[in-house]
Amino acid sequence: MEAAAELQIPVLVLDRPNPIRSDIVEGPLLDLNFQSFIGKYPIPIRYGWTVGELAQKIVAEQWIPAVPSLSVVSMEGWYASLWYDETNLPWVKPSPNIPDVGTALIYPGMCLLEGTNVSEGRGTDHPFKWFGAPWINGKILSQELNKLHLPGVVFVPRSFTPISIPGVADKPKYENQLCDGIEIRVITRNKYQSINVGVSLSLIHI
């Protein structure tokens, strides 16, 4: 939109659903002192808006240096509590490591751990659902996490070996090394709190 504004080109957004519902919001607002390419606006981690609603908010709040002429074509037959897999629309990966709605739900919390020395499952068939490292005891970690009784989720021990996958995971953490850890198994997605899970994982000491 910034480039369109600079070139005086109108922007037309054909709105699409937020894949993990629009009526659930999680996480703190971004501190703009830590603004980056992956976090640009003062919005929660799981912000809930559709792409059209986000575009309208960016323009209304003037979060970019120049704002374009924006038009949003609204959806029909959509409501905020719909999951993407309830829309009958084909799934298009928003990222190579988000292959399905289940991963999209888990991602907002697990992405907080990408900068750590623990594998977030890249280089496996279950990115962000698996979490571990060669020095972790998955049995103990799963037991400690399950003691927290976090809503909508159970944690089970999981061993895995990350590998490079062309176009998906290039030299992932602990490539070709056996990692022990946990699998995040969502059992009630309407109750699952992604950010709470990510923060809880980061605070566990084993």
Predicted features by range, described:
Residues 35-107:
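Conserved anion/nucleotide-ligand pocket segment
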Residues 1-2:
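Active-site-proximal cofactor/substrate-binding loop regions of enzyme domains
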Residues 6-10:
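A short helix->loop->beta-strand "cap" motif at the edges of active sites that frequently abuts
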Residues 204-206:
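Conserved small/polar residues in nucleotide/adenosyl-binding loops
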Residues 12-34:
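Glycine-rich, charge-decorated loop segments at or immediately adjacent to ligand/cofactor-binding or catalytic sites
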Residues 77-158, 162-163:
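Glycine-rich, aromatic-lined ligand/substrate-binding cores of catalytic
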Residues 150-200:
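Substrate-recognition/cap regions that form aromatic- and gly/pro-loop-enriched pockets
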Residues 14-17, 75-76, 133, 187:
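Active-site-proximal beta-strand/loop segments in catalytic clefts of secreted hydrolases
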